[in-house]
Amino acid sequence: MSSKRLAVLEKMTAAGSKDPFAWYGLAMEYSGLGRTDDALATFEKLRALDASYVAMYLMCGTMLAKAGRVDDGRAWLESGITAATAKSDGHALSELQDALAGLG
C-alpha cells in the first residue's frame, strides 16, 4: 500500500469529492492496511453517496466476513445482489451470489 496514494485519497474525500471511485479506493486502501473499521465507515459513506456502486458491496462484504463479522458481511452482499440486479450487472451478481454462498 502506498502511503502517498492513501494521503491523496484522504485529501480528495475530505474535500468532499463526489467521485465514487475515490471513496472506493480509500476504503480499499484502509482494508489493505487492516483498518477494517475505517474501511467500513468509508464504504458506508460511499453507499450514502452512490448506492448503485456495485463493486463496494462485494469488497465490503468479503472484508467483513474475513474479519469475523459474517452477519454484517452477509448483509452487504445481499444489498449488493439487489444493486446488481437493479443495474442488470450479471457479472457482479454472479460474484456476489458466489460470495454469499461461500458464507454458508
Feature locations, PLM:
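Conserved structural position within tetratricopeptide repeats
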Residues: 11-14, 44-48, 82
